[in-house]
Amino acid sequence: MVEKIRIIGIDPGLRRTGWGIIDFLGNHMHFVASGTLHSDAQLNLASRLHQLHKGLSEVVHQFMPHEAAVEHVFVNKDATATLKLGQARAIALLVPAQAGLPVFEYAPNTIKKSVIGVGHGAKEQIHMMVKRLLPRAEFDGHDAADALALVICHSAHRTNFAHRIKG
């Protein structure tokens, strides 16, 4: 009997954190839900991080995934922005870990290569492929679509790892 695995993907950001959930039953993918959490830019950093923590905790509690995949941050020229993104990413790692989930991390180029076949591509290409692989998927923006792409990436790596163990 094939076991259903539910995976959440998290695309962290201080302004917007995308999330997407897909069920896997054997080789079949089934879209469950996706969305974008927003933090209030008028609040201080601690309050914004709290908003993200609370929102992501509610998503994990509601959908009860088995595994989580989180995107690695990229370093840019603005050190302050990179630091804030890193703090939002810490929330994205912490929430599933607190729920007892194994957490996996993927670089943006790895995600793109898994979804569209090359490590460099436009967001539109990724979103088009997510829609092709998950025709019933609904996402409210780039961040949620990226989170779904992250789940697809993790499922490919998860499957390859399982085959290596069996072989």
From Swiss-Prot:
- List ligand-binding residues for Mg(2+) 1: D11, D143
What does the record give as cofactor?
Mg(2+)
Which residues of this protein are catalytic?
D11, E71, D143
State where Mg(2+) 2 binds: E71
Q: Which UniProt keywords apply?
A: Cytoplasm, DNA damage, DNA recombination, DNA repair, DNA-binding, Endonuclease, Hydrolase, Magnesium, Metal-binding, Nuclease
- EC number(s) stated in the UniProt entry for this protein: 3.1.21.10
Q: Where in the cell is it found?
A: Cytoplasm
**InterPro entries tied to this protein:** RNaseH-like_sf, RNaseH_sf, X-over_junc_endoDNase_RuvC
- Using the UniProt record, name the top-level EC class of this enzyme in a single word: hydrolase
- What's one GO MF term for it? crossover junction DNA endonuclease activity
Cofactor, how bound (note):
Binds 2 Mg(2+) ion per subunit.
A GO cellular component annotation here is:
cytoplasm
Which reaction is the catalytic activity of this chain? Endonucleolytic cleavage at a junction such as a reciprocal single-stranded crossover between two homologous DNA duplexes (Holliday junction)
An example GO BP is:
DNA repair
Assembly mode? Homodimer which binds Holliday junction (HJ) DNA. The HJ becomes 2-fold symmetrical on binding to RuvC with unstacked arms; it has a different conformation from HJ DNA in complex with RuvA. In the full resolvosome a probable DNA-RuvA(4)-RuvB(12)-RuvC(2) complex forms which resolves the HJ.
Return the similarity comment: Belongs to the RuvC family.
Q: What task does this protein carry out?
A: The RuvA-RuvB-RuvC complex processes Holliday junction (HJ) DNA during genetic recombination and DNA repair. Endonuclease that resolves HJ intermediates. Cleaves cruciform DNA by making single-stranded nicks across the HJ at symmetrical positions within the homologous arms, yielding a 5'-phosphate and a 3'-hydroxyl group; requires a central core of homology in the junction. The consensus cleavage sequence is 5'-(A/T)TT(C/G)-3'. Cleavage occurs on the 3'-side of the TT dinucleotide at the point of strand exchange.
Descriptive protein name: Crossover junction endodeoxyribonuclease RuvC
Which organism does this sequence originate in? Bartonella bacilliformis (strain ATCC 35685 / KC583 / Herrer 020/F12,63)
What lineage does UniProt assign to this protein's organism?
Bacteria, Pseudomonadati, Pseudomonadota, Alphaproteobacteria, Hyphomicrobiales
